[in-house]
Amino acid sequence: MQTILVLTTFLSAWFLAVGFDVFWNVPSQQCKKYGMKFVPLLEQYSILVNKEDNFKGDKITIFYESQLGLYPHIGANDESFNGGIPQLGDLKAHLEKSAVDIRRDILDKSATGLRIIDWEAWRPIWEFNWSSLRKYQDKMKKVVRQFNPTAHESTVAKLAHNEWENSSKSWMLSTLQLGKQLRPNSVWCYYLFPDCYNYDGNSVQEFQCSEAIRKGNDRLKWLWEESTAVCPSIYIKEGQLTNYTLQKRIWFTNGRLQEALRVAQPKARIYPYINYSIKPGMMVPEVEFWRLIAQIASLGMDGAVIWGSSASVGSKNHCAQLMKYIADVLGPATLRIKENVARCSKQACSGRGRCTWPKDTSVIAWKFLVEKEDYDFYLGDIECKCVEGYEGRYCEQKTK
């Protein structure tokens, strides 16, 4: 215990310079009724958890669809809520209610921390609304047809496409700008952006985002320019464990992380979402959890968000299972990798940046960050991602 506390103190000071923050976005306060307290355990491993284990708080707040404003969407039974689509929603009323919601859930006007907007019902890029989301395209076309009853079908489709993307942009952008205005010291992102939809492939290249997806994500330039963080998802799902080899899972993760690096603004932070629970009672395998955190860190990213559902802490047994998993897997993995990020920074980056391995075409550099403390990093493969004010391969020069 003493070793952990000493190391935690060292890391807290070191991360002021190089930064690798791991946030706890799990409703583990549900476990208090069973006498289980997660905050002391998580803090032993330098995991950022809200005071009193509140789900929304000083370190992190996520706004689900029903918790921020008047989000227009279509329900499972095709029932329209708040207009159903952005074009029919009341944006002014939405922003007024959003302001109330933000002030309620983030009380401190000067609060720092990470704030995430989780809107998943529809996608702002028209052609990304496929499969079950095609209902949004259909509803948008019906609205356009009402105002253009004699227009050719191709004209209706083009108008619907343009109006959808313009309206979606207005809703997402104005909501993000409102959050930044009300809580300017916090870092803001949309969950699951960017996505890659890279579900199949037989090589590292084939698991990269396709050209069509990259072009679609490029049309979200307005989102990347306004976001102070990007928060993609690299969750491990049960189907991946049964249908993918370990190598394919590595490539899948890499493809999504590479797209986040590609679209993020230079000063934007990157906090990918990872999971510890695949379904209630089934935890992410130990080697997979270590790999997820290490892959994020090996690309010089700012940290990660650990997410869990209310169902994953919905019983005494599940709470006990999570507490054991933190002590055995999640905590040690987080602490080791945070420590190695700091150590590599000191060895290679003059303590002024994070190590990256830009020529890592085989996606193996993450393994360096799971090694034990006596491992020496080979500087010849490393380029440093420098903190503001420094530059050079090893952050050895002050910015002119």
UniProtKB/Swiss-Prot annotation:
SUPFAM superfamilies: (Trans)glycosidases (SSF51445). The keyword DNA-binding does not apply. Expressed by the venom gland. Residues 1-19 form the signal peptide. GO terms for molecular function: hyalurononglucosaminidase activity. It catalyses: Random hydrolysis of (1->4)-linkages between N-acetyl-beta-D-glucosamine and D-glucuronate residues in hyaluronate. The keyword Cell inner membrane does not apply. Pfam families: Glyco_hydro_56. PROSITE patterns: EGF_1, EGF_2. Keywords: Disulfide bond, EGF-like domain, Glycoprotein, Glycosidase, Hydrolase, Secreted, Signal. Belongs to the glycosyl hydrolase 56 family. Spider venom endo-hyaluronidase that is able to degrade purified hyaluronic acid (HA) and chondroitin sulfate (CS). Has no activity on dermatan sulfate (DS) and heparan sulfate (HS). Also increases the dermonecrotic effect of the dermonecrotic toxin (AC P0CE80), when injected in rabbit skin, supporting the hypothesis that venom hyaluronidases are spreading factors. This is Hyaluronidase.
